[in-house]
Swiss-Prot record:
Residues 141-211 are annotated as: Sigma-70 factor domain-2. One of its GO terms (molecular function) is DNA binding. InterPro entries: RNA_pol_sigma-70_dom, RNA_pol_sigma70, RNA_pol_sigma70_r1_2, RNA_pol_sigma70_r2, RNA_pol_sigma70_r3, RNA_pol_sigma70_r4, RNA_pol_sigma_70_r1_1, RNA_pol_sigma_70_r1_1_sf. This is RNA polymerase sigma factor SigA. The gene is sigA.
Length: 374
């Protein structure tokens, strides 16, 4: 490992502000940062969406472009040092519990389990051959690390993508690592490849797995919360509370609740309900904008009573009130507008309206509407 790498301060020892500042400095030098890099560097601090948005705005104000395209963005040494702490069981090619696969996939897992793993010296030898343009060496390096892809993909099962799709996305990340690996930096290929495989899988989950797209940085946060949740479930023998999760992650309970809410998958209104599947979820959800049956019935009765009362007025009085109060179309008119309709002055309309309202206030008519006004 290079001296420069040995002197790199571990991420865990840096404060969130130090990591943010380091990203800004790096962005100023390159002129660009990717969402993937920002998400990976800030993942240990579990920022919520508002905090991340605020920081991204700060990055933009510093004149740094933030890009979605992580294809050409290499991990820095701090990120690779973090990946070195990860360990995977490359001998276990079993299928995760609850995952159904077909025979071709089972055969694939069996075959890659037979491929010999590489020693550090063999990795370097292959890397040198790749540098010299040896295509066959690329294939050998990739083939020897297909187990690594499966091991990483297992950790993302249950996040909205099929196990096979996770493996395929991880394999794409592996091929990117093969293309870009520089053995002179002192890291093992598996360390370098782990970063690229993880990036490919998490980005695919963010882009494809959910009905509502979640930013990559929030996917990382959700993944961390799920790992903590599973660990606590094993320790406690029950589902942990948001308070317990927050204590483990060093997060306020409200932030945990927010993350859990974001992590929920939307449910289709077409989801069948009942044994016969003849009803759907949408049938049982109240339309807050719709008039309730009781209110609708009361409105229809009021309309009938109002029509009866208006029929006791002269045609002109009835029509003046209909226009003034918008009884037919919901649009009220001014005295002047009604006057133009009847070809009289606004003062004459006011007099007709006043006379009509006096008639309606008479007990013989008002008692018909009294119940609706209480």
């Amino acid at each position: 490992m290079s001296d420069k790498t040995k002197n790199t301060k571990p991420v865990a020892e840096l404060s969130v502000e130090q990591v943010k500042e380091a990203l800004i400095e790096e962005g100023k030098k390159k002129g660009i940062l990717t969402y993937a890099k920002i998400a990976a560097r800030l993942a240990p601090f579990t920022l919520d969406s508002d905090q991340m948005d605020e920081y991204l705005e700060h990055v933009g104000e510093a004149g740094i472009e933030v890009s979605d395209d992580a294809d050409d963005e290499d991990p820095d040494e701090t990120e690779l040092v973090k990946e070195e702490t990860e360990s995977f069981d490359l001998t276990d090619m079993s299928v995760p519990p609850g995952v159904k696969i077909n025979d071709p996939v089972r055969m694939y897992l069996k075959e890659i389990g037979r491929v010999d793993l590489l020693t550090a010296d063999e990795e370097i030898a292959l890397a040198k051959r790749i540098e010299a343009g040896d295509i066959e060496a690329k294939g050998r390096l990739a083939e020897a690390n297909l187990r690594l892809v499966v091991s990483i993909a297992k950790r993302y099962v249950g996040r909205g993508m099929l196990f096979l799709d996770l493996i395929q996305e991880g394999n794409m990340g592996l091929m990117k690592a093969v293309e870009k690996f520089d053995f002179n930096k002192g890291f093992k290929f598996s360390t370098y490849a782990t970063w690229w495989i993880r990036q490919a899988i998490t980005r695919a989950i963010a882009d494809q797995a959910r009905t509502i797209r979640i930013p990559v940085h929030m996917v990382e946060t959700i993944n961390k919360l799920i790992r903590v949740q599973r660990s606590l479930l094993q320790d406690l023998g029950r589902d942990p509370s948001p308070e317990e999760i927050g204590e483990e992650m060093d997060l306020p309970t409200e932030k945990v609740r927010e993350i859990l809410k974001i992590a929920q998958e939307p449910v289709s209104l077409e989801t069948p309900i009942g044994e016969e599947d003849d009803s759907h979820l949408g049938d049982f959800i109240e339309d807050q904008d719709a008039t309730s049956p009781s209110d609708h019935a009361a409105y229809e009765l009021l309309k009938e009573q109002l029509e009866d009362v208006l029929d006791t007025l002269t045609d002109r009085e009835e029509n003046v009130l209909r226009l003034r109060f918008g009884l037919d179309d919901g649009r009220t008119r001014t005295l002047e507008e009604v006057g133009r309709v009847f070809g009289v002055t606004r003062e004459r309309i006011r007099q007709i309206e006043a006379k009509a309202l006096r008639k309606l206030r008479h007990p013989s008519r008002s008692k018909q509407l009294k119940d609706f006004l209480e």
